[in-house]
């Protein structure tokens, strides 16, 4: 009789448990993590498609966030504030990390207390909002006939939540995605108070996934596969040796998941882990659009000590076929004067002289002679290029490999003789009736021996003829394309542009 009672007791107890499922949520880790700055703004709106762990970096409090939730991040004084229906504040910022291995989760119709046991009068361990979730473990019906769910919180605690305010969902999202603006990204994010009054948004992900969002933005996916693979190797080496990364040309153009292409993804996967090394150590590599027929020595364009970079030397680019190989831009004297800090209204440009000290003729300084005296500007390739503003092409000259042809189209009679100069705009002239006037129009009428001719008062009389587009250090993208089309393999392409190196995992 006693045996029968005991068996009946255990049978009744087992009926209380409706479902039991083993589960173990884990934050996704990356073998080669990188962080890419996506934004630095007063506020950012971010949508999370997938399950993410949300951590306050100030106090290490953690929670799981509801899939497809939108968070709004902003600054309040020294703090980062994140609003997801509920507000969170931290002076250190927040981390949002991908979570693996959650098959089912509990979400809530309103704020719900997590209890120590399956009873409403038991200890409250936490309270979760509608924006938060917990990992589902199992369910039971208590002695009052109430259904409760056993759940696991992000901080590792287990507890019970009532079915009356809880819904159990299957996790159907295989690839968690972060959306910022119109672009989507793999991985997680950091929301940091790095800049005063702004929230810095970093995308944290694995290096190989990062490259999938770089290559199609740096090289057309339609180009030869060996060129794409060379680009993947060089981009990987650059990123692996960079202290910080941005999603612009300041580092490498990174468009995220929304810009990935099957062809460039294959190039990344087929070169996985391969980098450029010198003396057995990975090096930081560089690339650009067009060399113009020869790449540059790093010491000729970045004022670096060439002896420290024996792999960043000038090499021929025999198969480069680019629309940017040769170019020409013309400028007015007023444009040049403004770039050098002079007022064209009261300063006359007399001459412009480039100093080409690079092995191929790269210009490292420019001197102008003016009525206010001479001025020389010396600097690396970006300093020189920005002296000559142009439409498009990032707003400045394509490279610092150029020559200058200056045509002084005016001969002006002064009290001291004749001067040859580029322009007469803003200058005083003596008229036939003996009065003096200032030239203010864009054109001037000039009496010649045979007729009156009209000329621009400030013509585009200074012409720069140059080659290449970019800093020209390391790999030319158009050059890599040409080599690939002529039978070169990716590793040999990379070794061509980075002399004295090995290319391997």
Annotated model-derived regions:
Residues 1-505:
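Conserved, single-site charged/polar hotspot
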């Amino acid at each position: 009789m006693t045996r029968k009672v005991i068996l009946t007791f255990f049978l009744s107890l087992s009926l209380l448990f409706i479902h039991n499922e083993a589960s173990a949520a884990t934050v996704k880790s990356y073998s080669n993590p990188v962080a890419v700055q996506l934004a630095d703004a007063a506020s950012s709106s971010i949508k999370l498609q997938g399950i993410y762990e949300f951590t306050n970096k100030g106090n290490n409090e953690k929670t799981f966030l509801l899939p497809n939730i939108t968070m709004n991040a902003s600054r309040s004084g020294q703090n980062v504030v994140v609003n997801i229906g509920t507000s969170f504040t931290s002076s250190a910022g927040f981390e949002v990390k991908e979570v693996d291995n959650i098959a089912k989760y509990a979400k809530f119709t309103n704020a719900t207390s997590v209890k120590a046991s399956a009873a409403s009068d038991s200890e409250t361990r936490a309270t979760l909002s509608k924006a938060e979730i917990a990992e589902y473990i199992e369910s039971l019906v208590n002695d009052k006939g109430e259904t409760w769910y056993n759940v696991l919180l992000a901080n590792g605690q287990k507890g019970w939540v009532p079915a009356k305010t809880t819904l159990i969902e299957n996790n159907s999202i295989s690839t968690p995605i972060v959306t910022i603006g119109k672009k989507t990204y793999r991985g997680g994010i950091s929301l940091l108070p790095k800049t005063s009054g702004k929230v810095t948004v970093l995308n944290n992900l694995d290096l190989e996934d990062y490259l999938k969002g770089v290559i199609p933005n740096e090289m057309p996916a339609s180009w030869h596969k060996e060129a794409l693979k060379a680009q993947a190797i060089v981009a990987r080496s650059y990123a692996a040796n960079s202290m910080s990364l941005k999603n612009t040309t300041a580092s490498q153009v990174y468009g995220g998941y929304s810009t990935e292409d099957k062809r460039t993804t294959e190039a990344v996967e087929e070169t996985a882990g391969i980098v450029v090394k010198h003396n057995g150590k990975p090096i930081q590599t560089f690339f650009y659009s067009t060399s113009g027929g020869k790449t540059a020595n790093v010491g000729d364009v970045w004022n670096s000590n060439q002896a420290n970079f024996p792999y960043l030397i000038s090499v021929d680019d025999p198969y480069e076929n680019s629309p940017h190989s040769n170019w020409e831009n013309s400028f007015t004297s007023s444009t040049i004067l403004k770039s050098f800090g002079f007022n064209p209204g009261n300063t006359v440009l007399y001459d412009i002289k480039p100093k080409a000290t690079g092995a191929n003729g790269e210009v490292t300084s420019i001197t102008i002679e003016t009525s206010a005296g001479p001025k020389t500007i010396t600097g690396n390739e970006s300093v020189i290029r920005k002296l000559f503003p142009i439409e498009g092409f990032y707003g400045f000259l394509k490279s610092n490999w150029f020559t200058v042809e200056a045509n002084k189209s005016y001969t002006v009679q002064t009290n001291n003789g004749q001067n040859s100069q580029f322009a007469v705009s803003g200058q005083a002239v003596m008229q036939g009736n003996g009065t003096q006037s200032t030239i203010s129009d864009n054109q001037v009428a000039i009496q010649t021996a045979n007729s009156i001719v009209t000329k621009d008062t400030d013509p585009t009389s200074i012409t720069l003829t140059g080659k290449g587009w970019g800093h020209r250090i390391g790999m030319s993208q158009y050059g890599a394309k040409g080599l690939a089309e002529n039978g070169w393999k990716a590793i040999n392409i990379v070794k061509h542009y980075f002399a004295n190196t090995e290319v391997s995992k």
